[in-house]
Each structure stands twice: as structure tokens, then as C-alpha cells.
Amino acid sequence: MRFRTADGVVIEGATFEDIANVLWQQVMVPELSLHDWMVENAKRAEMWDGTKLPVSSVEDHIRAMIAARHLVELSD
């Protein structure tokens, strides 16, 4: 899977968890855990454009980012 982020960076991974891990590590000061990153990312998304991202699972979080167009899937 390949995606373009809202700021134009192209990322890729085999699973939603891979994608989330790439996004987590791109934060200037990464949170201590992937779950903590999802919580903080959800806060940033809500402040940015009002999007409410779930933090119940990595898959739900990434799917919501795709639905909100925070991530745009690129064809191979």
C-alpha cells in the first residue's frame, strides 16, 4: 500500500499497522507507543479540520484517515 499524506509525503507499508508505524515515526518527537500516537494524532486531526479519528484499533484509525482524505491511496 502506498499513500500520500496531507503534506505531500509518500509513505508505504504492507499493512495498516506498517502505515501507522511510518506516520508515528515521522512525528518530530514521537510518542512512547503507537496507541499514544493515535490518541495525539486524533487530537491534531480534530483541531486541524474537525475530523474525529477512532483510536480503538490501528485499522480503524488509518481507515478513518483515508476517509477524511488525510491519506490518499496511490495506485502502484
Task: Give the positions of each predicted feature.
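N-terminal acidic leader/helix
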Residues: 1-29
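Acidic, aromatic-enriched beta-alpha/helix-loop junctions
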Residues: 23-55
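Short, compact, well-ordered microdomains
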Residues: 50-76
